[in-house]
């Protein structure tokens, strides 16, 4: 993996990430393909939105279809017919989400499969082995996502466990001679001193890139902003910086301004399936009756397949009728919106115009789509 910084404006960075399956211009948004597919999208349609890289889920692919199936195809790229880069998360967040169904120990996490109830055990070493079989361009260390709320002692204990797992992840990744990139994940809850301790220890281990984890897990927006503002500028300058699971268009603009290079979130795809669509001038709830006879496109400034070919009235009809095509067209639009958003941010950084661009973005979004 190579990472090149091409331009900076304040803390914001314009870069290029070179990976085994291609290059990624940053800041970049990564659509989430949990089960080896971005919901309601073909790989060709996903590429047409401008997606340079997508995210796969180690935990879910391990459970279904299973590693033997993916391995028989030579890895996740051929299995899902996606020839661009893939990042896989480690499974830590999904295990965290199981709640009472899982038991965390020093060795790893015991849990009941959400599919058939089978007893399973996921460790840092197993996560690295799974991600090596998947052959993702970027793998993530196995960590514990610190819950919110957490006391300082609780967050410290969780963070220290994640650091021990980070060391084990690094060692196993190297033992497997995985040629791809491995990213560390900074934890520490809502406490700046713990974030600093986590980052220092991860930096000492050494990773290809560094992610900020444990945000957008239910904490107030002001806490997320505070931890982001504290942590982002302290991440190693010559490595890509990844803000996990975030977020809204406004979150992405704020993250870029803070120096973040990579983002992922289910929001554009999940919202699309629920009829919540993003536009330059605010959000549209396509199910609302006001769109029943509206012949306009969702967003006249958008060049996506949906906006070039279909009216709001048609999308309203599809949503009301429960047609699968509605989810497909909505997802195409939302993902193209996110790719356009990050492309414009890249251009603004290169032009030294990010501050005024961000101000225009906020003004436009507050106008309200009509």
Swiss-Prot record:
The reaction(s) this protein catalyses: 7-aminomethyl-7-carbaguanine + guanosine(34) in tRNA = 7-aminomethyl-7-carbaguanosine(34) in tRNA + guanine
Disulfide-bond pairs as recorded: none
Segments of this protein annotated with the region RNA binding: 245-251, 269-273
Pathway assigned in UniProt: tRNA modification; tRNA-queuosine biosynthesis
Pfam families: TGT (PF01702)
Binding site for substrate: 89-93, 143, 187, 214
NCBIfam families named among the record's database cross-references: Q_tRNA_tgt, tgt_general
Entry similarity comment: Belongs to the queuine tRNA-ribosyltransferase family.
Subunit structure: Homodimer. Within each dimer, one monomer is responsible for RNA recognition and catalysis, while the other monomer binds to the replacement base PreQ1.
Biological role stated in the UniProt entry: Catalyzes the base-exchange of a guanine (G) residue with the queuine precursor 7-aminomethyl-7-deazaguanine (PreQ1) at position 34 (anticodon wobble position) in tRNAs with GU(N) anticodons (tRNA-Asp, -Asn, -His and -Tyr). Catalysis occurs through a double-displacement mechanism. The nucleophile active site attacks the C1' of nucleotide 34 to detach the guanine base from the RNA, forming a covalent enzyme-RNA intermediate. The proton acceptor active site deprotonates the incoming PreQ1, allowing a nucleophilic attack on the C1' of the ribose to form the product.
Official protein name in the record: Queuine tRNA-ribosyltransferase
Native source species: Aromatoleum aromaticum (strain DSM 19018 / LMG 30748 / EbN1)
């Amino acid at each position: 993996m190579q990472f090149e910084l091409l331009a900076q404006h304040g803390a914001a960075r314009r870069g290029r990430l070179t990976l085994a399956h291609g290059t990624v211009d940053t800041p970049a948004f990564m659509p989430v393909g949990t089960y080896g597919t971005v919901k309601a999208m073909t790989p060709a349609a996903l590429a047409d939105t401008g997606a340079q890289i997508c995210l796969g889920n180690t935990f879910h692919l391990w459970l279904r279809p299973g590693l033997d199936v993916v391995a028989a195809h030579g890895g996740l790229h051929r299995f899902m017919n996606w020839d661009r880069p893939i990042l896989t998360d480690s499974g830590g967040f999904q295990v965290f989400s199981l709640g009472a169904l899982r038991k965390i120990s020093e060795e790893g996490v015991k849990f009941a499969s959400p599919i058939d109830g089978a007893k399973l055990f996921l460790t840092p070493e197993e996560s690295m082995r799974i991600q090596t079989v998947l052959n993702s361009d970027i793998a993530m260390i196995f960590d514990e996502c610190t819950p919110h709320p957490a006391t300082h002692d609780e967050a410290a204990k969780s963070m220290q466990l994640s650091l021990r797992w980070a060391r084990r992840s690094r060692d196993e990744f190297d033992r497997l001679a995985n040629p791809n990139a491995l990213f560390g994940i900074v934890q520490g809850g809502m406490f700046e001193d713990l974030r600093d301790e986590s980052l220092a220890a991860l930096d000492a281990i050494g990773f290809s890139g560094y992610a900020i984890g444990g945000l957008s897990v239910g904490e107030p927006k002001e806490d997320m902003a505070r931890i982001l503002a504290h942590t982002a500028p302290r991440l190693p300058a010559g490595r890509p910086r990844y803000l996990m699971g975030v977020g809204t268009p406004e979150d992405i603009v704020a993250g870029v301004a803070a120096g973040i290079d990579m983002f992922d979130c289910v929001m554009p795809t999940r919202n699309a399936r629920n009829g919540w669509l993003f536009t330059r001038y605010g959000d549209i709830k396509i199910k609302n009756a006001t769109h029943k006879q509206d012949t306009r496109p969702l967003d006249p400034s958008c060049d996506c397949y949906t906006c070039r070919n279909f009216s709001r009235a048609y999308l309203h009809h599809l949503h009301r009728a429960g047609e699968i095509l509605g989810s497909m067209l909505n997802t195409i639009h939302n993902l193209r919106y996110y790719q356009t958003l990050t492309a414009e941010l890249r251009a603004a950084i290169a032009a030294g115009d990010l501050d005024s661009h961000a101000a225009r973005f906020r003004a436009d979004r507050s106008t309200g789509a009509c």
